[in-house]
Amino acid sequence: MTLVDVRTPDPKRFIPGATGDWEVIVGMEVHAQVLSNSKLFSGASTEFGKPQNSNVSLVDAAMPGMLPVINEECVRQAVRTGLGLKAQINKRSLFDRKNYFYPDLPQGYQISQFKDPIVGEGKIVISLGPDRQGQFEDIEIGIERLHLEQDAGKSLHDQHATMSYVDLNRSGVALMEIVSKPDMRSSDEAKAYMTKLRSIVRYLGTCDGNMDEGSMRADVNVSVRRPGEGFGTRCEIKNVNSIRFIGQAIEYEARRQIGILEDGGTIEQETRLFDPNKGETRSMRSKEDAHDYRYFPDPDLLPLEFDDAFVSALAVDLPELPDDKKERFVRELGLSIYDASVLVSEKAIADYFEAVAAGRDGKTAANWVINDLLGALNRTGKDIEQTPVSPAQLGAIIDLIKAGTISGKIAKDLFEIVLTEGGDPAEIVDARGMKQVTDTGAIEKAVDEIIAANPDQVEKVKAKPTLAAWFVGQVMKATGGKANPQAVQALVKAKLGIEE
């Protein structure tokens, strides 16, 4: 593969060193587990968390005479992902044997794709920001390829004092290896890339994106150079399993390499591991090249071929993806780019928002979902799937505000009650006497009392009419937030002689 530099050096991304500025170059190989009930070449289950060695077929265990049979659903999922990445779909691809020895690789080789992958070049657009001016920066990250391959098993070193065990539940599970071009220039860009890629495969339903379960993990390639120079020697950081760790690994590795080069040393091409406890990378082994794996076409598998109709049928059924959904939210609902970006960041959040916004004002729904619901979930360490407030309940609260039944302040209190106790919002309002006061006589009485008790403030308002807001706040406080805010404001201004 010939590396092409498509980015113009950007001073705001330079890393200052003792002898001048440096630029970090990042590319990623992301292993995404295909969402499928069975493995790539066998009928064994892919269910996570099952007892050790319970999801293993004779094919997965590499028993003599067992032959691989391609899982068509895994092929479909790879093509769907390629379409979602706006990539070239190769209607003819080959499976190869990647030869290496490891205890949890029973075949002695991994079935992968080398020269002829199922998906070719594509792209992902990431967005950084907003900056201090509220602007976003869109950056296109190239996709080099996507290929299908088997996962290996798992070596267990903590089960016995002197022996290691092997769990083959993952052996043969289908992976999509999604290889980016070296187009990223900071840890923030790399984190945004991984976040966007995970969002896309979740929208597509081709990978669950659960990094804590190993369903998505990244090999991060890092090198540094002086701005304007050619690519430096890269080091690969293996199996980074969280977006936060990706950022930490890149920042540490870039600093490590800069330190070596500034001291007159050279960077050795190698594979490294990231230690999240120490926040540093350490050497694992020298980096292999393709010829070290002795790739050759797998003689047990025919070339994988399909036609345009196969691809077209999958393309027609693709769901609306994050970028398209964000554009629609901005165009049709009048949301800001920031709010739309937050709402489409996860499919579950977007689905929740659309359920709340159906038949209601989009901006109001967005404010409640982003500021109140997501804020509450962040405080309690829950995600959107665990929310105790359903879209119907949140929508009902918004409806009560619009109908004038409750004020905005009371709505906040009502939301907290629904969040902690559940229940129907309208019934809670009735049972707890939370309806706002719309009786102008009662409101006028409260306004008169506040004005009479604060003659000094009345004089100040005459000089500075904007201070009338203080009286509005006092009346709202006196009525327990139940008074209609618009009615209070109108009466305060009328009583104080402030013209509209």
Curated annotation (Swiss-Prot):
Cite the entry's keywords alphabetically: ATP-binding, Ligase, Nucleotide-binding, Protein biosynthesis
Q: Does the keyword S-adenosyl-L-methionine apply?
A: no
GO BP, one annotated term: glutaminyl-tRNAGln biosynthesis via transamidation
Q: Which reaction does it catalyse?
A: L-glutamyl-tRNA(Gln) + L-glutamine + ATP + H2O = L-glutaminyl-tRNA(Gln) + L-glutamate + ADP + phosphate + H(+); L-aspartyl-tRNA(Asn) + L-glutamine + ATP + H2O = L-asparaginyl-tRNA(Asn) + L-glutamate + ADP + phosphate + 2 H(+)
Could you list the residue ranges that cross the membrane? none
Q: What is its EC number?
A: 6.3.5.-
Q: What does it do?
A: Allows the formation of correctly charged Asn-tRNA(Asn) or Gln-tRNA(Gln) through the transamidation of misacylated Asp-tRNA(Asn) or Glu-tRNA(Gln) in organisms which lack either or both of asparaginyl-tRNA or glutaminyl-tRNA synthetases. The reaction takes place in the presence of glutamine and ATP through an activated phospho-Asp-tRNA(Asn) or phospho-Glu-tRNA(Gln).
What is the annotated quaternary arrangement, including any partners?
Answer: Heterotrimer of A, B and C subunits.
Family to which this protein belongs: Belongs to the GatB/GatE family. GatB subfamily.
Q: What is this protein called?
A: Aspartyl/glutamyl-tRNA(Asn/Gln) amidotransferase subunit B
User: What's the source species for this entry?
Assistant: Rhizobium leguminosarum bv. trifolii (strain WSM2304)
Gene that encodes it: gatB
